[in-house]
């Protein structure tokens, strides 16, 4: 990485102190006008790219000179990043725009070890930076002098609405009383290595039709809003060694694809179902958030499912576009994603070093930028107990023509490792100045990396989760654990009570226990005869509003029926259903429906040898 030696600092113009102004961020009561001067790091005669990989700007804050170092967030977009919108006649249009030469940066202030920055350099400098423990915002001024910018503290932005804003989550999903600190978890070496392994979340953001109307159908403005928020989201989650890669956005330009309502819990339920049934079928991703301009009921500005990362339906959240400031919406995104990752709301005992905490139930008027000690411990406990598999899959790295940025924590083309800037790197395996492995080392991190060396071939790196799963072992040639694999579909399991399906052993009894509790068992055949009628909620298939009854041999592949143990001469057939998710209460695919037979995707009971 090219180092720039600043011999003298020459500011173009002395800053101007202003009292009040209307900016894109809102009404600002106290601000400075500054003229950031770019210090080029390019050698003389070198070609000037539109957006350089690294940049430095000089300006004054409170009369004191500062140097802002910026590095392009190369990992912001995945290789298969896509954008989807809808034509006036309802046709789905998906494009794959080039995003390598984007204008979104992370950074720091020179000589301030605790500083951070999230900046868009698309049209001037817009974003925020932390300087000497205080949060500042910067954005261009719409003046004839195009170099003029306003710098101001967040506290000087007039609040649009003084009413409190809150997350809609009202209960915890795990009860650890008291919360065990990380030091009290008695982690095994394997668990500690797992926690230290870099995680990746491939994210899709969906903008609803109210967003389209709010931004007057300006898709560029919507994209810019999303990009800026995810750039900040990425910076926030660096504290957990998690990289957020935006793999796609979808804009409901021709109307909402679900009923987006002011009742946040209803909207979240509908969005989760739509994501599972529709979005996942045409876009691979780990997590999805709905960004809406609708005003949720009460003080709610966001809602998410808890401890649900990688789940097809529940790895979702909804966020209200409630502030003009990108950082405030980004913090709400980070909060809801935190719920997916096992974090509860912070209690009075939780500490952020005197700063606002991201997982506070109430959104502070000052933007939170840190997770509390409680959030850290809850997140680690969730990871250890649940091992969500999707976050270990590294997204594809764009084949970038321009040189990679050494020091941005993201391993890019030509790099062997990247542990951040030399002043912050704490990894003994990596040379932070060159992003190459140190002599004699083989790896930086990974489930098959220990003390900078590949683990020996045959060392187990992922235990089998069930008899239908397969334990993975290191190859001795890579730091990564091989792709998660499982026993062949159709292999008998649970003493021939089921057949393996995608690493699990689905049975009717287990599904009854899941829905109704441990005292329930599968109902007798007479209950399943209701599926032969094809009426109401009892059927095998449904196409739009038309339902199809089960054939006699397929009746145990339709609606699931359960009973509460022996009940004398009376049989009470119990079933469940959901109007918002028609698959709930149906027999799971791959379930045994007879000797040597399983339910297939069309809910037919077929020979297990031909089912897969």
UniProtKB/Swiss-Prot annotation:
Supply the PROSITE patterns for this chain.
ADAM_MEPRO, DISINTEGRIN_1, DISINTEGRIN_2, ZINC_PROTEASE
Keywords of the record, alphabetical order, are: Calcium, Cell adhesion impairing toxin, Disulfide bond, Glycoprotein, Hemostasis impairing toxin, Hydrolase, Metal-binding, Metalloprotease, Protease, Secreted, Signal, Toxin, Zinc, Zymogen
Chain residues that bind Zn(2+): 335, 339, 345
Chief subcellular location: secreted
* Xref: SMART domains: ACR, DISIN
UniProt: Ca(2+) 1 binding residues: 202, 286, 390, 393
Q: What's the protein name? A: Zinc metalloproteinase-disintegrin-like 8
Natural source organism: Crotalus adamanteus
